[in-house]
Amino acid sequence: MSVYFPIHCPDYLRSAEMTEVMMNTPSMEEIGLNPRKDGLSYQIFPDPSDFDRCCKLKDRLPSIVVEPTEGEVESGELRWPPEEFLVQEDAQDNCEETASENKEQ
């Protein structure tokens, strides 16, 4: 019993057919880039003057606005100001308010 099965696939070309394809295909020199109808040639690399103009426009950094979130903090996420600082600050504010109210009376 043989386990060898010949593969008959029409997608693959035999060597003689491939040779014929290679002989009838135009070479890379014949293909070349043709200019467009408006007479301008194709430009593969950017023009250095465009690069200088682009850099001058990027002198300013864009404005980035970050809004604080009021949601729960995920584990491991750092928040500023730390919660301990906020608790201490609130306690100080409450003490100052109480002291000012006592002075007014």
Curated annotation (Swiss-Prot):
The compartments listed are:
Nucleus; Cytoplasm
Modified-residue entries (Phosphoserine), positions: S63
Does Nucleus appear among the keywords? yes
Locate the coiled-coil region(s) and give their ranges: none
Q: Which GO terms describe its cellular component?
A: cytoplasm; nucleus; protein-containing complex
- In its keyword annotation, does this UniProt entry include Repressor? no
| BP GO annotations | negative regulation of DNA-templated transcription; positive regulation of DNA-templated transcription; regulation of MAPK cascade
Would you say which domain of life the source belongs to? Eukaryota
Q: List the keywords (alphabetical).
A: Cytoplasm, Developmental protein, Nucleus, Phosphoprotein, Transcription, Transcription regulation
What Pfam families does the record point to? Lbh
InterPro entries tied to this protein = LBH (IPR013294), LBH_dom (IPR038990), LBH_dom_prot (IPR042945)
LBH domain segment(s): 18-104
Q: Where is the signal peptide?
A: none
What family does the Swiss-Prot or TrEMBL record give for this protein? Belongs to the LBH family.
So what does this one do? Transcriptional activator.
What is this protein identified as? Protein LBH
Organism of provenance: Bos taurus (Bovine)
Q: What gene name is listed for this protein?
A: LBH
